[in-house]
Amino acid sequence: MYLGRHFLAMTSKALFDTKILKVNPLSIIFSPDAHIDGSLPTITDPETEAALVEAARIIRDTDETVAFPTETVYGLGGSALNDNSVLSIYRAKNRPSDNPLITHVSSIDQLNRKVFNQPHLSGTSLFDNIPSIYRPLISSLWPGPLTILLPVPSSEHSALSKLTTADQPTFAVRIPANPVARALIALSDTPIAAPSANASTRPSPTLASHVYHDLKDKIPIILDGGACKVGVESTVVDGLCNPPTLLRPGGFTYEEIVKLGGEAWSLCKVENKKTVEKGEKVRTPGMKYRHYSPSAKVVLLVPHCEGDGILKGVDRMERLKRLIETELKANSNIKKIAILTSLKLRDSDLQSKIFNEPDFSSKTFIIERLGQSGEEIQTNLFAALRKVDENDKVDLIFVEGINEEGEGLAVMNRLRKAAANNCIQF
C-alpha cells in the first residue's frame, strides 16, 4: 500500500551537513561468483573501506539514506526492508510515492535471504525464486544495468517494504556492476531501494557534484566514486507477461536483450507509452510524471527517416535558424542558448551560419558535443544537460537527437521526456 502522491507534505525540516566521502572503486575486489553466493569483497584502500563501513551502518541501522555511484547513474539508497527509510528517499527527492523503486541486491543469495526470507538449503538452487525466462539474461548481464520484475513475495514471507512497489503485484530488482554499489549493499547485508539521486524531475546525476547540487543538506553522505560509465538508468524488462516486454530502455540495448535472452525473448516488445494516464499504475520507474528536465526549456531535434521527404531540400542550418527565431519571438528574455550536438551538426557550420547571423548578435551561444557514437552520447547526455543548465545558466537548450536504435532508444527516451512536447522533426 502506497501513501498517495501528496504524502510529501509531511517533509521534515531536519537538515544534514552533507559529507562527500571519496572512494576508490579499483580498491574493491569481488570473487567471480560473489554476485551469486554473496561472498564479501576485499577492500585494499583503508579510506574507501572506512567510508563504506560508515555508509553501510546508515543503511542497516538508521532510517536515513546514502547517495552512491552505480554504473548507470548515482543512486539515492535506503533500506528496502524499512518503510521509514523508503519514506526518507521520497522526501529527499520530493518524489511521488506512486512511482515504484528498484531494489538493488549484491547477490542472488541476498535476494533469497532478505527479500524472500529463504536461507539457502543444501540441495536447493539459489535461482528457485527467479522465473526461468530471466536466467539466460541474468547469466550474461548480471551484475549490470538490467532490472527484472519478480512477483512480490507474500507478506508473511518477506520484509520487503510495500512502499517500494507502489502497490503493484511485482517488484523491480537488479544486481549493480559498480563495485562501490555492490560493496555497500554487501557490507550492509541489506537490499537497497534506490532511484536516481537527484531532485525529482531533474536530469539524473552522473557525478557526485550533481548529487550535491540537488540534495545538499537533505542527505547525510554522498559516496564519490567518480563518473558513471553508462550514463542512463538500467534497462527494465518484464518476463512475467506474454510476450515479454522491455518497459524502459537503458544501459543494455533492446538488441542485446533479444540476442542474449534466448528464444523466449525473440518476440520481446517495447513499451511505447511515453507516459501513463492519470490514475494508471506503473510497473517501473520512468513511465510517470515529468523526468530528466533542466530548468531551461529543451527543444529536441528529432532526426527524420531518410527518404520520407519531411525536410527534403531544406538545409539544416536554415531550419535551425528559423527555430531559434521562433523561440526568440515567443520569449524576448532569452539571452543564452545551448546547442547539444551529436552526429550531424558541425561546429563550423553553426559558427558561420548561426552564431554570426546579425539577428543573433546580442545572444550568447554555447556548443556542447555529446559524442560521435551512441555509447558516447548516452554516457555524456545527463552531464551535458546539467552543465549548460546549472553552470552556463542558459535560457534555451536545443538537442540534436539520434536514430532510435542501439543506445539511441534509451537516449531518445530520456530526451523526449526532457523536452515534453517540444520535439521538432529535423
Swiss-Prot record:
The keyword Transferase applies. Residues 49-252 form the YrdC-like domain. Changing residue 174 to E: Severely impairs t(6)A37 formation. ATP binds at residues 95, 99, 170, 196, 204, 248, 292. It catalyses: L-threonine + hydrogencarbonate + ATP = L-threonylcarbamoyladenylate + diphosphate + H2O. Signal peptide: none annotated. It is an enzyme of class 2 (transferase). Its EC number is 2.7.7.87. Disruption phenotype: Causes increased leaky scanning through AUG codons, +1 frameshifting, and read-through of stop codons. Also causes progressive telomere shortening. The keyword DNA-binding applies. Belongs to the SUA5 family. This is Threonylcarbamoyl-AMP synthase. It comes from Saccharomyces cerevisiae (strain ATCC 204508 / S288c) (Baker's yeast).
